[in-house]
Amino acid sequence: MKHPFSRFFSFGEKEQEETMEKQEKEEVRKIPVSKIVPNRFQPRTIFDEEKIEELALTIHTHGIIQPIVVRECEDGKFEIIAGERRWRAVQKLGWSEIPAIIKNLNDKETASVALIENLQREELTPIEEAMAYAKLLELHNLTQEALAQRLGKGQSTIANKLRLLKLPQEVQEALLHRTITERHARALIVLKDKEKQLKLLQEIIDKQLNVKQTEDRVLKMLEAANPKPKPKRKAFSKDMRIAVNTIRQSLTMVANSGVAVDSEEEEFEDYYQITIRIPKK
């Protein structure tokens, strides 16, 4: 069995075997809660306190079913690799110790495990997910297509999430706090102009616009910024002016002879029309 993150860490076969041997010898240890620190690479920036309370109640009733995973730091502390929600829950219960497995991972491996583990749980906000993808691309120097293959996701999914990081910080914060949805945010991307994006963001919040209403507002704002130019009429050529004036003079002569001539003139983009009506009687 291969290491679950070997595709990212680029372990060789020998290294994988050594890793598996170490894992087989790993034991669950009780570690003081006070000596544990959060993962500095944790993609989740907001923890739902209500859900932490629910988890604490479950742990109080059933105990810790799955130990947290940590790595030892130089200052005698232990940094969480996986299981921060469980650690926060036992703190609420007032536990002094928590069962943990200690792993020997470097910063790159620790960051990758934390990011991938959270992505697999599918509990991140769209902006946290986008940040996780961006960090994995940076850590492993991957293309979006390669990352998508390794995570088992579509390349368009990765690309759409990463576009959210181009939005103003205020919009990203709204996504983070779930004030707006990802589809609202995608509609704002189309505007490109930061001032307009923030103006519409406030309108979405104040008027509680749904996605369809937001998309309609974006369309109107784009149309207002880029009005369709009115078609320019072609100028009269010298020959055309002579022709029109000659017809007018002829009509005047006919009218002066006592014939009731009725005429209408109409200008079009490509031609000039003169309609002449002469009664039979």
UniProtKB/Swiss-Prot annotation:
Domain of life assignment = Bacteria
Among the GO biological process terms of this entry, one is:
chromosome segregation
Primary location class: cytoplasm
What keyword terms does UniProt attach to this protein?
Answer: Cell cycle, Cell division, Cytoplasm, DNA-binding, Septation
Q: Which GO terms describe its molecular function?
A: DNA binding
Q: Answer whether the UniProt record assigns the keyword Mitochondrion to this protein.
A: no
Check the record and name the InterPro entries matching this protein: Chromosome_partition/occlusion, Cro/C1-type_HTH, HTH_ParB/Spo0J, Nucleoid_occlusion_protein, ParB/RepB/Spo0J, ParB/Sulfiredoxin_dom, ParB/Sulfiredoxin_sf
Q: Which Pfam families match?
A: HTH_ParB (PF17762), ParBc (PF02195)
Q: What name appears for this protein in its UniProt entry?
A: Nucleoid occlusion protein
Species in which this protein is naturally found: Geobacillus sp. (strain WCH70)
